[in-house]
From Swiss-Prot:
Ranges for domain Ferritin-like diiron: 1-159
GO molecular function: iron ion binding; oxidoreductase activity
Positions with a binding annotation for Fe(3+) 3: C171, C174, C187, C190
Function description: May provide oxidative stress protection via catalytic reduction of intracellular hydrogen peroxide.
Binding-site list for Fe(3+) 2: E57, E107, E141, H144
Protein name: Putative rubrerythrin
Domain Rubredoxin-like: 166-204
Quaternary structure annotation from Swiss-Prot or TrEMBL: Homodimer. Possesses two rubredoxin-like centers and two non-sulfur oxo-bridged di-iron centers per dimer.
Protein backbone atom coordinates (compact mmCIF):
# COMPACT_ATOMS: atom_id res chain seq x y z
CA UNK A 1 0.00 0.00 0.00
CA UNK A 2 1.41 3.41 -0.95
CA UNK A 3 1.82 5.88 1.89
CA UNK A 4 -0.22 8.98 0.90
CA UNK A 5 2.09 11.23 2.91
CA UNK A 6 5.05 10.35 0.73
CA UNK A 7 3.02 10.47 -2.50
CA UNK A 8 2.11 14.07 -1.71
CA UNK A 9 5.51 15.15 -0.39
CA UNK A 10 8.05 13.16 -2.38
CA UNK A 11 10.45 15.09 -4.55
CA UNK A 12 9.29 15.82 -8.10
CA UNK A 13 12.47 14.26 -9.40
CA UNK A 14 11.52 10.87 -7.99
CA UNK A 15 8.29 10.99 -9.98
CA UNK A 16 10.13 12.14 -13.09
CA UNK A 17 12.68 9.35 -12.83
CA UNK A 18 9.85 6.87 -12.55
CA UNK A 19 8.14 8.30 -15.64
CA UNK A 20 11.40 8.12 -17.57
CA UNK A 21 12.01 4.56 -16.36
CA UNK A 22 8.58 3.51 -17.62
CA UNK A 23 9.20 5.23 -20.95
CA UNK A 24 12.61 3.65 -21.51
CA UNK A 25 11.34 0.19 -20.55
CA UNK A 26 8.44 0.46 -22.98
CA UNK A 27 10.71 1.80 -25.74
CA UNK A 28 13.00 -1.18 -25.34
CA UNK A 29 10.12 -3.59 -25.88
CA UNK A 30 8.68 -1.60 -28.80
CA UNK A 31 12.02 -1.55 -30.58
CA UNK A 32 12.35 -5.29 -30.12
CA UNK A 33 8.97 -5.72 -31.81
CA UNK A 34 9.95 -3.26 -34.55
CA UNK A 35 13.12 -5.25 -35.20
CA UNK A 36 11.10 -8.38 -35.93
CA UNK A 37 8.93 -6.49 -38.40
CA UNK A 38 11.95 -4.94 -40.12
CA UNK A 39 13.51 -8.37 -40.45
CA UNK A 40 10.31 -9.79 -41.94
CA UNK A 41 10.27 -6.95 -44.48
CA UNK A 42 13.85 -7.67 -45.54
CA UNK A 43 15.61 -4.87 -43.65
CA UNK A 44 18.28 -6.81 -41.79
CA UNK A 45 20.41 -3.78 -40.94
CA UNK A 46 17.43 -1.76 -39.72
CA UNK A 47 16.37 -4.72 -37.58
CA UNK A 48 19.81 -4.78 -35.97
CA UNK A 49 19.72 -1.03 -35.36
CA UNK A 50 16.35 -1.38 -33.64
CA UNK A 51 17.85 -4.09 -31.43
CA UNK A 52 20.92 -1.98 -30.70
CA UNK A 53 18.69 0.95 -29.76
CA UNK A 54 16.60 -1.36 -27.59
CA UNK A 55 19.77 -2.30 -25.73
CA UNK A 56 20.60 1.40 -25.31
CA UNK A 57 17.16 1.97 -23.80
CA UNK A 58 17.68 -0.98 -21.47
CA UNK A 59 20.85 0.67 -20.22
CA UNK A 60 18.98 3.95 -19.68
CA UNK A 61 16.23 2.14 -17.78
CA UNK A 62 18.81 0.37 -15.62
CA UNK A 63 20.36 3.66 -14.57
CA UNK A 64 17.01 5.31 -13.96
CA UNK A 65 15.97 2.39 -11.77
CA UNK A 66 19.20 2.71 -9.82
CA UNK A 67 18.64 6.44 -9.31
CA UNK A 68 15.07 5.78 -8.14
CA UNK A 69 16.22 3.30 -5.52
CA UNK A 70 18.95 5.65 -4.32
CA UNK A 71 16.49 8.52 -3.92
CA UNK A 72 14.09 6.26 -2.03
CA UNK A 73 16.89 5.51 0.42
CA UNK A 74 17.73 9.20 0.71
CA UNK A 75 14.14 10.15 1.56
CA UNK A 76 13.52 7.05 3.68
CA UNK A 77 10.64 5.90 1.50
CA UNK A 78 9.87 2.26 2.27
CA UNK A 79 6.96 1.83 -0.15
CA UNK A 80 7.35 -0.87 -2.77
CA UNK A 81 5.57 1.11 -5.48
CA UNK A 82 5.49 4.68 -6.74
CA UNK A 83 2.31 6.12 -8.20
CA UNK A 84 2.69 8.66 -10.99
CA UNK A 85 0.17 10.39 -13.23
CA UNK A 86 0.49 11.63 -16.78
CA UNK A 87 2.25 8.62 -18.31
CA UNK A 88 1.30 8.10 -21.96
CA UNK A 89 1.90 4.72 -23.61
CA UNK A 90 2.66 4.75 -27.39
CA UNK A 91 0.99 1.82 -29.14
CA UNK A 92 2.09 2.20 -32.77
CA UNK A 93 2.84 -1.11 -34.46
CA UNK A 94 2.92 -0.83 -38.23
CA UNK A 95 5.32 -1.41 -41.09
CA UNK A 96 8.95 -0.37 -40.82
CA UNK A 97 8.38 3.15 -42.14
CA UNK A 98 5.53 3.72 -39.69
CA UNK A 99 7.56 2.28 -36.83
CA UNK A 100 10.50 4.52 -37.67
CA UNK A 101 8.23 7.58 -37.70
CA UNK A 102 6.83 6.67 -34.29
CA UNK A 103 10.36 6.11 -32.99
CA UNK A 104 11.54 9.48 -34.30
CA UNK A 105 8.63 11.21 -32.60
CA UNK A 106 9.35 9.51 -29.28
CA UNK A 107 13.08 10.18 -29.35
CA UNK A 108 12.50 13.81 -30.34
CA UNK A 109 10.16 14.37 -27.41
CA UNK A 110 12.62 12.82 -25.00
CA UNK A 111 15.67 14.87 -25.96
CA UNK A 112 13.92 18.19 -26.64
CA UNK A 113 11.30 18.24 -23.88
CA UNK A 114 11.27 15.45 -21.33
CA UNK A 115 14.91 15.06 -20.32
CA UNK A 116 15.75 18.80 -20.39
CA UNK A 117 12.70 19.51 -18.22
CA UNK A 118 13.44 16.67 -15.80
CA UNK A 119 17.10 17.74 -15.59
CA UNK A 120 16.18 21.35 -14.80
CA UNK A 121 13.82 20.21 -12.03
CA UNK A 122 16.47 17.90 -10.57
CA UNK A 123 19.01 20.72 -10.56
CA UNK A 124 16.56 23.05 -8.79
CA UNK A 125 16.06 20.36 -6.17
CA UNK A 126 19.81 20.21 -5.55
CA UNK A 127 20.34 16.95 -7.42
CA UNK A 128 23.04 18.05 -9.86
CA UNK A 129 24.48 14.59 -10.48
CA UNK A 130 21.06 13.30 -11.47
CA UNK A 131 20.50 16.38 -13.65
CA UNK A 132 23.79 15.70 -15.45
CA UNK A 133 22.86 12.05 -15.95
CA UNK A 134 19.47 12.98 -17.42
CA UNK A 135 21.03 15.46 -19.83
CA UNK A 136 23.52 12.81 -20.94
CA UNK A 137 20.71 10.36 -21.63
CA UNK A 138 19.03 13.10 -23.65
CA UNK A 139 22.13 13.36 -25.86
CA UNK A 140 21.86 9.64 -26.57
CA UNK A 141 18.20 10.04 -27.51
CA UNK A 142 19.16 12.81 -29.95
CA UNK A 143 21.53 10.40 -31.66
CA UNK A 144 18.74 7.81 -31.84
CA UNK A 145 16.46 10.32 -33.56
CA UNK A 146 19.12 11.30 -36.10
CA UNK A 147 19.82 7.67 -36.96
CA UNK A 148 16.14 6.78 -37.32
CA UNK A 149 15.63 9.80 -39.61
CA UNK A 150 18.37 8.61 -41.95
CA UNK A 151 16.88 5.12 -42.07
CA UNK A 152 13.36 6.43 -42.70
CA UNK A 153 14.61 8.58 -45.60
CA UNK A 154 16.16 5.53 -47.24
CA UNK A 155 13.06 3.38 -46.71
CA UNK A 156 10.73 6.05 -48.12
CA UNK A 157 12.98 6.79 -51.11
CA UNK A 158 13.65 3.13 -51.83
CA UNK A 159 17.41 3.59 -51.50
CA UNK A 160 18.16 1.02 -48.79
CA UNK A 161 19.50 -1.32 -51.48
CA UNK A 162 19.86 1.10 -54.39
CA UNK A 163 22.27 4.05 -54.61
CA UNK A 164 22.90 6.79 -57.20
CA UNK A 165 26.54 5.83 -57.64
CA UNK A 166 28.65 2.74 -56.97
CA UNK A 167 29.36 2.10 -53.30
CA UNK A 168 30.90 -0.76 -51.38
CA UNK A 169 28.36 -3.23 -50.01
CA UNK A 170 29.44 -5.66 -47.32
CA UNK A 171 27.70 -8.93 -46.53
CA UNK A 172 26.65 -8.91 -42.89
CA UNK A 173 27.08 -12.67 -42.70
CA UNK A 174 30.48 -13.39 -44.20
CA UNK A 175 32.12 -10.02 -44.91
CA UNK A 176 32.22 -10.28 -48.71
CA UNK A 177 32.53 -6.82 -50.31
CA UNK A 178 30.78 -5.87 -53.55
CA UNK A 179 31.20 -2.61 -55.51
CA UNK A 180 28.10 -1.36 -57.31
CA UNK A 181 24.95 0.73 -57.13
CA UNK A 182 23.11 -2.27 -55.72
CA UNK A 183 24.18 -5.38 -53.81
CA UNK A 184 24.10 -8.73 -55.62
CA UNK A 185 20.92 -10.80 -55.44
CA UNK A 186 22.90 -13.43 -53.59
CA UNK A 187 26.27 -13.29 -51.88
CA UNK A 188 28.79 -15.19 -54.02
CA UNK A 189 30.70 -16.11 -50.87
CA UNK A 190 28.01 -17.44 -48.50
CA UNK A 191 24.84 -17.46 -50.65
CA UNK A 192 22.83 -15.26 -48.28
CA UNK A 193 20.28 -13.03 -50.11
CA UNK A 194 20.79 -9.32 -50.81
CA UNK A 195 18.88 -8.26 -47.69
CA UNK A 196 21.99 -9.20 -45.70
CA UNK A 197 24.09 -6.53 -47.44
CA UNK A 198 24.68 -3.04 -46.09
CA UNK A 199 26.74 -0.08 -47.22
CA UNK A 200 30.29 -0.43 -45.95
CA UNK A 201 30.98 2.28 -43.40
CA UNK A 202 34.13 1.94 -41.35
CA UNK A 203 35.66 4.86 -39.47
CA UNK A 204 38.19 3.92 -36.83
Amino acid sequence: MINNFFVINMKETLKNLTKAYIGESLARNRYTCYAKIAKQEGYEQIAEIFLLTAENEREHAKWLYYLITELKKKYNIDDKAIKVDGVEVPIVLGNTAENLKASIEGEHFEHTEMYPKFADIAEKEGLKEIADRLRAIGIAEKHHEERFKKLLKEVEEGTVFKKDKPVEWVCRKCGFVHLGKEPPEKCPSCSHPRKYFEVKCEKY
